[in-house]
């Protein structure tokens, strides 16, 4: 962990379709200012994120959000002592916008900057909560692009215990939402609709839960929803709600079984959960009930989706002894296990 004192870290998140900016005070251990802008409405008509649109919107919003974040913290930009930015994984264009902006600010202020692994930031933000987990712990990262089970042994030392072999959890939610004609983004829409449905109405598979490994597969579950949908002659809101609820229950059951098995295998009793899908209240409750007796840590709902706070906080660990470097070293594809190699 960083030994830097009196450090205020500016965090910049632009890996996909959220522009997030925050300032973390390492002395008070507080996020003292934070702004988040979502582009979801701009991508809704396309049914998913359009990289070019995302890049242009980040370019338009990032600098004003940085100014607002600094102002609301009661600071001057010169008071910032380090800059952290998402360097991967993510969309190349959006990553470049964030990285180049961070590097420009760092150079103008003669301050250090550091690139942060997006998924590690999702993992670490839980350490800011009270109570907080202690290394080592098991981590479940569930988002639009990832589904990972990780043995977090120490800072920067992560063993992949299980991962998706096809669709990520959030991706499956988006695709099922498209089948049900709910629109984008699918996660919140399915969760809302499922509240009115019967989770036992459709007998959907719990993929790979009979396998001895801890990997995931959600493509077949998505296909099962598609075939159930096609078999119905007259689709109405009740049937859609039942399908949404049944799908959501299948996902939650699958996650619970895989996590439970992984905790038994690793001997870890603390579970950290992060990523956008971790904001799903049904999944949260299912895991809490199913893992009774274990210690489970969730970030606040607003910190589950991509945000600048997690980047600023992660940056506080890595800014020690960082030298000025203007290289735009982004990594659109960046396995979390690569951090183990330094």
Question: How would you label these PLM feature ranges?
Answer:
Residues 131, 154-196, 222-223, 227-232:
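Glycine-rich phosphate-binding loop plus the immediately following alpha-helix
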Residues 76, 192-271, 280-289, 294, ...:
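A contiguous, well-structured pocket-lining segment that forms one wall/lid of small-molecule binding clefts
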Residues 4-7, 115-138, 314:
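Conserved phosphate-binding catalytic cores of ATP/NTP-utilizing and phosphoryl-transfer enzymes
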């Amino acid at each position: 962990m960083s030994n830097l004192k009196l450090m205020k870290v500016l965090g910049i998140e632009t890996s996909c379709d959220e522009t997030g900016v925050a300032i973390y005070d390492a002395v008070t251990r507080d996020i003292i200012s934070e702004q988040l802008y979502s582009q979801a409405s701009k991508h809704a008509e396309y049914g998913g994120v359009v990289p070019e649109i995302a890049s242009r919107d980040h370019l338009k919003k990032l600098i004003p959000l940085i100014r607002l974040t600094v102002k609301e913290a009661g600071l001057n930009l010169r008071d910032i002592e380090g800059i952290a930015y998402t360097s991967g994984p993510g969309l190349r264009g959006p990553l470049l916008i964030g990285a180049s902006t961070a590097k420009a600010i760092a150079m103008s202020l003669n301050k250090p900057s550091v690139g942060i692994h997006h998924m590690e930031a999702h993992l670490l933000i839980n350490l800011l909560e009270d109570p907080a987990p202690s290394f080592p712990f098991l981590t479940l990262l569930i988002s639009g692009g990832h589904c990972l089970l990780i043995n977090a042994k120490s800072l920067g030392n992560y063993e992949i215990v299980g991962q998706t072999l096809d669709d990520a959890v959030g991706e499956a939610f988006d695709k099922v939402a498209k089948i049900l004609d709910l629109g984008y983004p699918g996660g919140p829409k399915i969760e809302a609709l499922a509240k009115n449905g019967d989770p036992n109405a459709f007998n959907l598979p719990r993929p790979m839960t009979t396998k001895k490994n801890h990997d995931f597969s959600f493509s077949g579950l998505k296909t099962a929803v598609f075939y159930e949908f096609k078999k119905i002659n007259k689709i109405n809101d009740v049937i859609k709600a039942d399908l949404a609820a049944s799908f959501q229950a299948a996902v939650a059951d699958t996650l619970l079984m895989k996590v439970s098995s992984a905790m038994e295998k690793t001997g870890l009793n603390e579970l950290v959960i992060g990523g956008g899908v971790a904001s799903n209240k049904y999944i949260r409750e299912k895991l809490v009930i199913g893992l009774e007796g274990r210690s489970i840590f969730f970030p606040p709902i607003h910190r589950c989706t991509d945000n600048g706070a997690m980047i600023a906080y992660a940056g506080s660990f890595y800014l020690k002894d960082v030298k000025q470097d203007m290289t735009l070293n982004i990594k659109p594809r960046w396995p979390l296990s690569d951090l183990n190699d330094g």
